[in-house]
Amino acid sequence: MLKRFSRVLAASARLAGSLAGMAHADQPVINFGIISTESSQNLKSIWEPFLKDMSQQTGYQVKAFFAPDYAGIIQGMRFDKVDIAWYGNKAAMEAVDRAHGEIFAQTVAASGAPGYWSLLIANKDSKIDSLEDMLANAKSLTFGNGDPNSTSGYLVPGYYVFAKNNVDPVKAFKRTLNSSHEVNALAVANKQVDVATFNTEGMERLELTQPEKPRQLKVIWKSPLIPGDPLVWRNNLSDEQKNKLRDFFFKYGANAEQKKVLADLQWSKFQPSDDDQLLPIRQLELFKQRTDVANNANLGAEEKAAKLKALDEELAKLEKRMAEREQKTAANAG
């Protein structure tokens, strides 16, 4: 009798496992793209609790999608392999323009800061103490630049540090490399690279994961404020999918457990956003292009004038949209 009961119990367990597997297989899948700001192993550990909650509360099977660079996530969205993603602003701009992406939410720093800042860092023992020092000694320095689709690692320093000073980093330095935020910071800490781009969020994260490393770094330049990172979904998701995702994101962070999950991601509750979040980033990209054209000695006068006129017209349109948005925001606040 006992043996028969054991066989029935075992068969029931196998059936339950089989049914659970079938139920899991029948769940609609949402692929969540995560940009490679640090090693995939570190990212998996901090994202897993959030994605698990997302699965439970939406009813979707949420799978993390990692790629070695930002372009991999953008391409994944372009070919419908990524449904929703956390991007920086520059990468989000590429996703909106080239991968039918649409911004629906914005991250908010756990500290409540309205955004974050791009940094240039050097080793604490370095004689390079300022942006001016770096530019004056560039020919003897190895420079760690960011991913070409990174806002704080590439676009922002590309304009404020290099374009405004008429400097091409590829030509100016002894050697230039492109890496993730974490790789750049560790390379500077270990004296493998002389100067590199980084950001304040990455610094806070490094203080948690490898607290001895930030002590080997010093900040030699800090950018103007960068808006918080956007969350982007494919604009061809169904209304049902968008409503479920929107409901999850804007309610998440209501209890202590969820707040802890967000805090581990260095965030507090999400806030609604849209593609207009990118207007300052688009302006920055156009400013950089305009500076590059103005300083391009290989362009003839007529061609240069035509390119500058076209860029100025684009900038004027952007400035008008930004002014209209500010007026609307002020009216809503009033």
Residues covered by each model-derived region:
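Bacterial N-terminal signal peptides that target proteins for export
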Residues: 1-10
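Immediate post-signal peptide segment of exported/extracytoplasmic ligand-binding proteins
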Residues: 22-34, 135-142, 315-334
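Bilobed "Venus flytrap"/periplasmic-binding protein-like clamshell domains
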Residues: 27-55, 67, 90, 117-186, ...
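Periplasmic-binding protein-like
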Residues: 31-36, 43, 109-119, 211-246, ...
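An extracytoplasmic/periplasmic, membrane-proximal ligand-sensing/linker region
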Residues: 38-39, 45-49, 244-334
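Pocket-flanking alpha-helical
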Residues: 65-102, 202-208
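Short helices/loops that flank or line small-molecule/ion binding pockets
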Residues: 71-85, 98, 116, 181-196
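A ligand-binding cleft/hinge motif common to bilobed small-molecule-binding domains
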Residues: 89-99, 162-163, 189-190, 194-215, ...
